[in-house]
Amino acid sequence: MRCLPVFVILLLLIASTPSDTVPLKTKDDMPQASFHGNARRTLQMLSKKQCCWYFDISCCLWP
């Protein structure tokens, strides 16, 4: 009985999705800055993770 309101809300959300007239974004539509930001974030994470490889856990700070 508790699932019924959740089910109704989900049905309403599905019904309110955009129609086919709206073009869907593809990976080609993404701005190049987001790719550079993702690469920079990955490199920063790997540089922070590198200190863990030397068993110095005190310097490992996960974002």
Curated annotation (Swiss-Prot):
Pfam family, one: Chi-conotoxin
Any GO MF annotation of the entry: toxin activity
Signal peptide range: 1-19
Modified residues (Pyrrolidone carboxylic acid): Q50
UniProt PTM: Contains 2 disulfide bonds that can be either 'C1-C3, C2-C4' or 'C1-C4, C2-C3', since these disulfide connectivities have been observed for conotoxins with cysteine framework V (for examples, see AC P0DQQ7 and AC P81755).
Keywords, sorted A to Z: Cleavage on pair of basic residues, Disulfide bond, Neurotoxin, Pyrrolidone carboxylic acid, Secreted, Signal, Toxin
Subcellular compartments: Secreted
One cellular component (GO) term of this entry: extracellular region
Tissue/organ expression: Expressed by the venom duct.
InterPro entries recorded: T-conotoxin
Main location: secreted
Propeptide residue span(s): 20-47
Superkingdom of the organism of origin: Eukaryota
Entry's free-text remark on domains: The cysteine framework is V (CC-CC).
UniProt record similarity statement: Belongs to the conotoxin T superfamily.
Record's protein name: Conotoxin TxMRCL-D012
Lineage: Eukaryota, Metazoa, Spiralia, Lophotrochozoa, Mollusca
